[in-house]
Amino acid sequence: MDDVIIVDLEGRLVMGVGDELLRDVMNEIVAEGWKKIVLNLRDVNIMDSSGIGEVLSSWKLAQRFGGAVKLLRPAPSVKRTLRLTQLLPLLEVFDDENAAVKSFA
């Protein structure tokens, strides 16, 4: 699907490191008109409360403009953090890129 953008994130999604980058990228993507957004978390090895906050803010931003954010391949430690914060029922998580993209149909 040509109307889905996949954002590859890597490293640490923590306060002062990846959280601000994610915010900037999401603002740019939404300003460009993208509404179907997949955040690829495969290479994110650490996510703290700031990172979780930015993922949630990304989800809210997309929804505000009629879009959606879905998560792809979170590492086990990141998935555990999402589960502990009870965000997994709210956010759709996929292990397969094609499934994530097709879920927007």
Language model segments and positions:
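Acidic phosphotransfer microenvironment of two-component signaling modules
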Residues: P76, N98-A99
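Amphipathic alpha-helical interaction surfaces in cytosolic regulatory modules
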Residues: L13-L91
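Short acidic-hydrophobic, aromatic-tinged amphipathic segments that line or gate anion-handling sites
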Residues: E92-D96
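Residues at the C-termini of beta-strands that transition into short coil/loop
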Residues: E10, E97
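Short beta-strand/loop segment at the start of cytosolic alpha/beta domains
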Residues: M1-D8
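A short, charged, amphipathic alpha-helix used as a generic interaction element across diverse proteins
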Residues: S103-A105
